Regions:
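Basic, flexible Lys/Arg- and Gly-enriched helix-loop patches that mediate nucleic-acid binding at interfaces
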Residues: 1-241
């Protein structure tokens, strides 16, 4: 059966649909020897689909990992400059997993890795408004008026943010410690939100995605999601099979 190419790549655990579109655009995908184009349809049972020159097959068993990404680690599976990536931290995992979304190089915390492209696409889809919670250490004292601005939504270069939930944990004259929950996944969003209200982020750690928590997982360590966590996450993002 013919399907859109990005959907096939997602089903085969190559990448989320969004990431698959980028791969097609970058010329990394071919169908029957010809470069793929966005919008192309194919049949996995009939066509020879290659990604980076390697023929893809039907998906292996679905795997879901939780990683506590440390700072100074790239949210990619490879790096031409030899820097540490999340792939270096999941040795022993045979499944071809990929990160769902990203944490920037200087941020740490909860990162989901999976070979379930449909699940990844659902988590990243802006329409799902999946909550993501961060611990934030910022410079200076965050005044109530700026908390209110963040909670109402704030204008960034790429548009207004959805309302955030901000909990002040503790503060001094020099720093503020906050728990911030957002429902989007824009690039460096929390850092940019804080900069817009006049505060630089000193430390940023994601501790929760929807109902999945980092818990006591050590920095640089990973674990497999429990069946209960997988079931709950699938239910929240739209009853994915």
């Amino acid at each position: 059966m013919e399907e859109r190419l990005q959907k096939i790549l997602a089903k085969c655990g190559i990448a989320s649909r969004r990431q698959a579109e980028d791969m097609i655009f970058e010329g990394l995908v071919t169908v029957n020897g010809a470069p793929a184009v966005l919008g192309m349809k194919a049949d996995l049972d009939r066509d020879h689909i290659k990604v980076r020159g390697k023929l893809i097959h039907t998906v292996e068993s679905k795997v879901y990992l939780i990683l506590n990404k440390p700072e100074k680690c790239l949210t990619t599976m490879s790096d031409s400059e030899g820097r540490m990536t999340v792939k270096n931290l999941i040795k022993g995992v045979k499944a071809k997993v990929f990160p769902v979304g990203r944490l920037d190089y200087n941020s740490e915390g909860l990162l989901i890795l999976t070979n379930d492209g449909d699940m990844a696409n659902a988590i990243l889809h802006p329409g799902k408004k999946i909550p993501k919670t961060y611990l934030v250490k910022a410079d200076g004292f965050l005044e109530a008026r700026n908390v209110e601005r963040l909670e109402k939504g704030i204008k960034l270069d790429d548009g207004m943010t959805l309302p955030a939930k901000v909990k002040q944990l503790k503060y001094t004259k020099a720093n503020s410690w906050l728990e911030i929950t957002i429902h989007e996944g824009r690039k460096r969003q929390v850092r940019r939100m804080m900069e817009r209200v006049g505060h630089s982020v000193i430390k940023l750690k994601r501790i929760r995605i929807n109902g999945i928590s980092l818990g006591r997982l050590e920095s640089g360590a990973f674990r497999y999601m429990t069946p209960e966590e997988i079931k709950k996450l699938k239910k929240e993002v739209g009853n994915i099979n």
